[in-house]
UniProtKB/Swiss-Prot annotation:
Phenotypic consequence of gene deletion: ALA and SIA axons exhibit outgrowth abnormalities, failing to run along the lateral cord to the tail. ALA axons are shortened further in a vab-8 mutant background. Drastically reduced expression of let-23/EGFR and plc-3/PLCgamma in ALA neurons. RNAi-mediated knockdown causes severe defects in the ALA neuron in young adults.
Annotated stretches, region: Disordered: 58-82
Keywords: DNA-binding, Homeobox, Neurogenesis, Nucleus, Transcription, Transcription regulation
An example Gene Ontology CC term for this record: nucleus
Sample GO molecular function, one term: DNA-binding transcription factor activity
Domain of life, per lineage: Eukaryota
Record field: compositional bias (Low complexity): 62-82
Pfam families: DLL_N (PF12413), Homeodomain (PF00046)
Protein's name in the database: Homeobox protein ceh-17
Function: Probable transcription factor involved in postembryonic differentiation of the ALA neuron, and regulation of genes that contribute to behavioral quiescence, a sleep-like behavior mediated by ALA. Regulates its own expression and also that of homeodomain ceh-14, together forming an autoregulatory loop in the ALA neuron. Involved in fasciculation-independent longitudinal axonal navigation in many neurons.
Native organism: Caenorhabditis elegans
């Protein structure tokens, strides 16, 4: 019994001196009491899976590191490509495209403005002061062309003229409501009816003046001195 305890303590001392290294060779404890071929087989049984798992972890770590390096390099290269492409596009947009668009828009705008201004000035009547000063040149219009440019006269039918004459006998100065009513009855615009009444009043004044002259020639004593007739008052208005 004493020899067994002595072998145990001697093996413990050897294990402490080796620094508790897990990979101690079996030869370091060959003289130990507990070293047997069975314990050596058990050591290899447990050590081999751990070593294999360690190698597998190391290989996986190296593979992941290499893949991470490849992905980092690919991402950096793609980012560099994107940055280069973005810089190229930005330089293109900042130099060529804006210049071309500005030049084209400037040319189109100036041509359009010039054509529009010339058309507006050419559309002005030459008889007016603005048309005479701003005309772009060319020979003045002859009377035939001026007649063509005049407004087309309205041709009244017999029924329209009868209705207008009847309304004129009722009043020489119809208001806008009366003119609109007349225009609706004879299928004309209110502006045409107003122009007709203006022309009819002018014609009526001329007829009344001619009639007065004839009356004075036939009977000069009929009119007393200083007397003003109603027709003269209307003519003065």
């Amino acid at each position: 019994m004493m020899m067994e305890y002595g072998g145990y303590f001697s093996s413990s001392a050897v294990a402490q001196q080796s620094g508790d290294v897990p990979t101690t060779a079996p030869s370091a404890v060959t003289n130990s009491f507990f070293y047997t071929p069975q314990s050596h087989n058990i050591y290899h049984q447990y050590a081999t899976p751990y070593l294999q798992s360690g190698r597998a972890l190391t290989t996986a770590h190296n593979t992941s590191s290499s893949s991470a390096g490849n992905s980092t390099s690919s991402s950096s290269s793609s980012s560099n490509y994107r940055n280069t492409t973005h810089d190229s596009l930005q330089a293109f947009f900042n130099t060529g495209l804006q210049y071309q668009l500005y030049q084209k828009s400037q040319l189109i705008g100036s041509d359009t403005i010039q054509r529009t201004s010339s058309n507006v000035l050419n559309g002005l009547p030459r008889s007016s002061l603005v048309g005479a000063l701003c005309s772009t040149g060319g020979a003045p219009l002859n009377p035939a062309e001026r007649r063509k440019q005049r407004r087309i006269r309205t041709t009244f039918t017999s029924g329209q003229l009868k209705e207008l004459e009847r309304s004129f006998c009722e009043t020489h100065y119809p208001d806008i409501y009366t003119r609109e009513e007349i225009a609706m009855r004879i299928d004309l615009t209110e502006a045409r009816v107003q122009v007709w009444f203006q022309n009819r009043r002018a014609k009526y004044r001329k007829q009344e003046k001619i009639r007065r002259v004839k009356d004075e020639e036939e009977d000069p004593l009929k009119k007393e001195p200083g007397q003003i007739s109603l027709e003269e008052i209307i003519d003065q208005i």
